[in-house]
């Protein structure tokens, strides 16, 4: 649904930028993430070529996206479209029944969002790719499944909304 400007531009908007970078760093890996960051700030990702005083550059978001895509040889525009151009966070919709765990991404713009997800099954942590916005895994009823146990992927978590509702109720008392 639609989000009001009051909801979109609350104090959480600043945290969203940090979480977006946190997710990008996890997705790219440290080496590639810092190469892209150095190139964005200094015009080179080659640290030894930097000499003091180091002059930072003024760049824009699209330049950073272009740097990330070029250095990774992949197109991550889908991620930036959802995280930076939409107020609503992507939601990972899950269901577990009949021996299957089904996961799918839902975004406010109904565009593909192939964000991989780390999932721990009985303590075995693996990263699962999303081919067609949907992932289905076979799991036993007794299996302990934890989705994104280290909170690497920025996404909407319904529990956050419940906490906000409870805070509002307490304020009214």
Pin down the residues of each PLM region.
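Generic detector of intrinsically disordered, low-complexity, polar/charged segments
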Residues: 12-15, 120, 158
